[in-house]
Amino acid sequence: MNRYYSVIGSVVFKKKKKDSDVSVLGFLPSSDAARECKAILDIVDSAFPNGMSEGVGEDCKLQEMFHKALELLPKLWVQEGLIDEAVNSYRRALVKPWNLDAKRLASMQKDLAIALLFAGVEVDLSPRFKIWCSTPPKNNMEEAILLLFVLMWKIQQGEIEWDSEVMDHLTFALTVVGEFESLADNVEQILPGVKTRAERWYFLALCYSAAGQNETALNLLRKVSGSSEAEHEPHIPSLLLGAKLCSQDPCKSREGISFARRAIDSTMNQNKHLLSQARKFLGVCYGNAAKISVSDSERNSYQTQSLNSLTQAAMLCKEDAETVFSLGLEYATQRNLTPAFDNALRYSEMTSGSTAKGWKLLALIVSAEQRFSDAEAIVDLALDETGQIDQLQFLKLKAVLQIARQHPNQAMETYRILLAMIQAQRQSGMDHEVLSDTKLEVEAWLDLARIYIDQDSWPDAQVCIDKAKSIDIYLPQSWHTTGALFEAQERYKEALVAFSFSLSIDPDYVPSIVSTAELLMKMASSQAFPIARSLLMNALRIEPTCHDAWFSLGKLSKMEGSAQQAADFFQAAHELKLSAPVQSFV
C-alpha cells in the first residue's frame, strides 16, 4: 500500500504546485497517474464494497488519499481525452457513500453534470451503476438535470453556498429539453438577496413566456414597472420583453405602446441596439393598434406612427433583419406594395433565404400585385429551401395560388399531396407537428370543398366539409363553407342558419358577416337593407381592406337608389381587390 500512497502523494503535490496544468503529475505521465489512481480506487472499493462507513475518522490518511484519488482520476481521464472514462469515474465516486465532505461532494456532482452536458458524447450507464438506482436516468441530459436539481436543493437547505454556475447550467439544460415551467419553479426557490426583485421577476417572465404562458409573464413584468419599483431605475430588459409580448397580441397593443415608450425614454442616448429594439416593438404595437381601431382618424394615425417607428428602428440598426421584416409587413398590410416588396426582398437577402416567413411574405406581396405565376415560382423556391414542417404551409399557399390562376385541377392535386404529407406525419408519431398542422388540414379540406362548390359538385363538397368538421366542429370557417354550399344550392334559409352559427362561434368572422348581409339583400325586402348595411359597416370596421364588403356595400347602395355612393363603393372595392393578396399577410 505504501507504493500507492506515494503515487497519490506525488499526484496531490503536483496538483497543488501547478493546478492549471494537469498533463504531468509528479514523475508520471497523466495516463500512468490515472492508472495508478484507478488501482488505489479498486483496492479501496474491494475493501469497502458498500462504501466507506462513517466510523473511519476524518484524520485517517487512507480516507484523505482516497478522496484525492476520487477527485483527480476523472480530471486525468479528461486530460487524456477519454470522456467516457472520466464520466464513469465521476459516477463511481458518487454512486456509493465515501464520507466526502459537503463541499467536495457538491464539486464532483457539478463537474459530472458539466461533463454530461458539454462532453458531446452519450456515455451509457453501465449495469454496475444501475443496481444502485431505483429508477436510472434515461440519458446523459436527464442525469445532468437530476444532479443539478440535487445541488439546487442543497443550496436551498444551506448545505452548500450559492453557486451561480449551478443555476446557469440548469437553465441551459432545462431550456434544451423545453422544461421552462420546471426552470421557473427553481428560480422561484432561489433565496432572497441572490437576485434583485426586478431580476427575479424578469427571469421568471422569460421562463413563462417560453412555456407559452404570456399572460403570467406579463403579470410579472407589470410588477417590475409597477409602483413598488418606482424608486429604482427602470429595468430595461423587462420593458422590452413586455413590449415584445404585447406586440404578439393586438388586444394588448396599447399596453405594448406604453412598455415600448418607457423603454425608449430609459435608453435614450445610451444604447443604440436597445433603442432600436424598443422602436421596433413600438412600431409593431402601433400597427396592431391600427387593426383594432374603431375610428378612421385613429387608425390612420396609428399606421403613420407605426411606419415612422419601424423606419427609425431600421435606421438605428441596419443589420437587424427582424426590423426589416416588420417594416415590410407593415407596408404590405397598408397595401403599399413597392416598399413592402423591397423590404421583404432585403430581408430574404439578409437571412440568405433561410426563413419560411420571409419567403411567405415575398410570395404574398407578389400575389397582391396580381402576379400569381411569379408568386407560385417563389413558393416553389421556398419548397426547395425550407424544411418538411414549413413545406406544408407552402403547399397550401401553392394550391391557393393555383386556384387564383384558374387551375382548380392542379390545386386539387396539390391539396392531395398536402393531406398525404400530414397523414404521413401523423403515422410517424410526430405529435407536436401533427398538432400544429391540424389547422392546415382543416383549411385544405375546406378549400377543396369550395372548389367542388364552384364546380357544382355538391356531394363531394359535403364530404370535404364533413372531413373538416370531424377534425374540429367548432370552427367558424367550417360553418361558413357549409353556408356557402347551401347558398349555391339556393337553400337560403339553411345558409343563413349556417352563417349565424359561424358568427356565434366568432362574431368578428368577416366572411360570414358579409355573406349574411348578401343573403339578407337576396331574401328580404327593402326593410332588411338597414340590417345588411349595419353588418357590412361592421365588417369594414373589423377589416377595412375587405373588398368583398365594399363591393356588397356598393350593390346595396345601388339597390337603394344611391348611384353615386354605389360608384364610390365599387371603385374602392376594385382598387382594394387589385392589391389584395391571395391570403392574409398575418
What are the functions of these language-model segments?
Residues D45, E64, W98, Q156, ...:
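Short coil turns that delineate tetratricopeptide repeat
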Residues N50, A69, K103, M108, ...:
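TPR alpha-solenoid repeat register
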Residues Y5-D32, S46-D59, R92-N99, A115-V150, ...:
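Short coil/linker segments at helix-helix boundaries
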Residues L28, G81, N139, G178, ...:
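Residue-level detector of the short coil/turn that links helix A to helix B
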Residues D42, V95, W153, P192, ...:
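Conserved structural position within tetratricopeptide repeats
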